[in-house]
């Protein structure tokens, strides 16, 4: 049984993103679909001294409609990435493992990559390495799948010889009746994640923060903590 997950690249993803990645035999970045403004594709949450806040990457959207994720460019005229780096430093510099990981994260953010997906994917790959996750990676842009939505997902599974698609539970409503998966004899299982608790600075525990929150607070224990939330059906 070859398990596959197919996910859009997101900015500083939460724990569940990496738990899903570690649960499969191959992980595909779905970077060939339409960009959704102010979605996880360009933002996520971290925990500051005053509580959780959004960090959102500014992007070029004026006069550009129906952009694919891979075609969206970052708007560097709006103080990014300095504003995000400053907030990360102010929020986490006193965390136990900040000094262990911060330089590598900041180095990627300061590279001023042109496209949104180049930055978000490079950060995700860094976090994958820091967590010691070894799942092979592929990209939908390199595979040219057929169709849209469930047809595209089934096509990606087929091209990569996967026979079990592990999907976020939120897609259950439209995947349950997918003829494309049935026709290709590809099974579907739904991934659920019970968010674990861990020692966290800046007050009362707040779940669903970016993976940086776990790394800065838990260090080498991050992967074992990540696994505590695993639950699939």
Write out the residue ranges for each language-model feature.
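Residues lining hydrophobic/aromatic ligand-binding pockets adjacent to catalytic sites
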Residues: 1-233
């Amino acid at each position: 049984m070859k398990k596959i997950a197919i996910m859009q690249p997101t900015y500083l993803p939460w724990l569940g993103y990496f738990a899903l990645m570690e649960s499969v035999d191959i992980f595909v970045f779905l970077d060939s679909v339409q960009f959704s403004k102010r979605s996880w594709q360009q933002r996520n949450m971290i925990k500051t001294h005053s509580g959780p806040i959004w960090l959102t990457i500014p992007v070029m959207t004026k006069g550009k409609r129906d952009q694919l994720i891979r075609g969206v460019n970052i708007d560097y005229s709006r103080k990014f990435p300095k504003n995000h780096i400053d907030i990360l430093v102010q929020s986490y510099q006193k965390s136990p493992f900040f000094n262990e990981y911060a330089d590598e994260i900041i180095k990627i953010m300061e590279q001023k990559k042109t496209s949104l997906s180049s930055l978000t994917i490079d950060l995700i790959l860094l976090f994958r390495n820091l967590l010691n996750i070894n799942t092979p990676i592929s990209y939908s842009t390199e595979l040219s799948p057929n169709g849209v939505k469930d047809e595209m997902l089934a096509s990606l599974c087929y091209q990569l010889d996967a026979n079990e698609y592990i999907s976020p539970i939120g897609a259950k409503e439209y995947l349950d009746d997918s003829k494309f998966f049935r026709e290709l004899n590809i099974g579907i299982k739904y991934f659920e994640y019970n968010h674990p608790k861990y020692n966290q600075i800046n007050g009362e525990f707040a779940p669903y923060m970016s993976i940086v929150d776990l790394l800065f607070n838990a260090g080498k224990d991050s992967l074992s903590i990540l696994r505590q939330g695993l639950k699939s059906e």
